[in-house]
Each structure stands twice: as C-alpha cells, then as structure tokens.
From Swiss-Prot:
Highest classification ranks of the organism: Bacteria, Pseudomonadati, Pseudomonadota, Gammaproteobacteria, Enterobacterales
Keyword Cell division attached: no
Protein EC: 2.1.1.223
One term of GO molecular function: tRNA (adenine-N6)-methyltransferase activity
Protein name in the entry: tRNA1(Val) (adenine(37)-N6)-methyltransferase
Record organism: Enterobacter sp. (strain 638)
Compartment annotation: Cytoplasm
Amino acid sequence: MSQPKALLRRDGFTFKQFFVAHDRCAMKVGTDGILLGAWAPVAGVKRILDIGSGSGLLALMLAQRTEQHVTIDSVELDAQAANQASENAAESPWAERVQVQCADILAWAPEQTARYDLIVSNPPYYEPGVDCGTPEREQARYTGSLGHPALLAAAANLISEEGFFCVVLPENTGNTFIKTALDIGWFLRLRTDIADTDGKLPHRVLLALSPKEGECFSDRMVIRGPDQRYSEDYTALTQAFYLFM
C-alpha cells in the first residue's frame, strides 16, 4: 500500500514491498541497480548470487520476483555495507531466503561447491585516479578493488551449466567487458542498451552472459518519453517496485 510522502524514511529508499536503508553504504540505491534487479532473467532459477551487494538492493528485488523456494546469497566486502544489507534482509518479507556474507568474492568463491543459476553484479567501473570522496566509495567504484577479468573468472567458477551472469555497466565499459568475457569462454546471450530519451545515445548497458552458447537477443530501452514521464517500457519493467508508479 502506498504511503504518504511525508512518512517516507530519509535514510534509504522505500519500495512497494520493502525498504532499503543505505545511509551506511558507499553506494546508494540508484537507477542502475533498479534496472538490473528488474531485468535479470529469473525463470527456473533456484539459487542466486549477488556479488558486491552493497545495501542488498538486488537480492531483495530478486527475492520479490522469485518463488519461495529460491535462495539468495549476497557477498559484500565492506563490513558496514554488509551489516546494513543483513539488516535490510532481516526486515524484508524474505528474511529466511536471503543470506549476506561479509567476504572478498575472490577468496570466497574457491571455497564454494554449489553452483548458482543466476549471478548478478553492479560492479566497479572507474579506473583508479577518479576522486570518489571516501575510501569506501573508492572500493565500491574503482575497478582496482575488483577488476573485471577477476570478476568474470570468479563468476565462471560459480555459475551453473545453463546459468546467467548479469551486470549493468556504462555503455563503453560494457563493450570492453563483453570482449574480455568472450576471450575467457563466456557467451553473450542478452543485451539491453539504456538511453535517457529517444534523442540521446545509450549511457548504460545490461548484459547477460552464459557459459552455454546460444542466440543473443539485443534491444534498446529509453527511461523517459518526450514528455519526460517514465516510458512505457521502463514503467512495465519497474512498476512492481517503485512506490509511486
């Protein structure tokens, strides 16, 4: 049920079915994460992994989109963010399905024996040298903290035979990410280029990679129409989450 705007908490983001506190997280809830959480394919999945979970946004969105038997593991390096993600999960309707680990994915991954049907990540993409303000934001945004080749290799060791590894990245970075992925044996299966409006070039790209070869489906989405309202496509994708949509 929608709440009056005056009653909304200011330390996070209120969705229709859950609240994400993010005041102790370097990276706040934003459009990139919401796009990825609403877009990632979930048909038939049983186990989901969120790499670099931050506030736990993706895990909670995917919990909302999946059946009760689906379990979700979140791995986050920063202790403050991991603690907040755990609290967010505990206060959500899916507390029993979401588990948060405070760990370095590169150390955590080799210890795992189970495989995941879906892995998601909103990974760092800034090169070292860009001022991010705090060490926590640098860790969350610099590729130096988790390089894309290392991320792809870790995901490859954790993905099921027909699973998908989904990310959101800036357009140019995404093209480089695809090349790196193809070079180490991934196949691109889904791609959605995101633009603010029809008249603008895409600025983000959603990618789904798989260890299994198959046809690649590509499309384009604009966030806002000519009247600056959310587009029909963006509304259809995200209206299950946004409180006032």
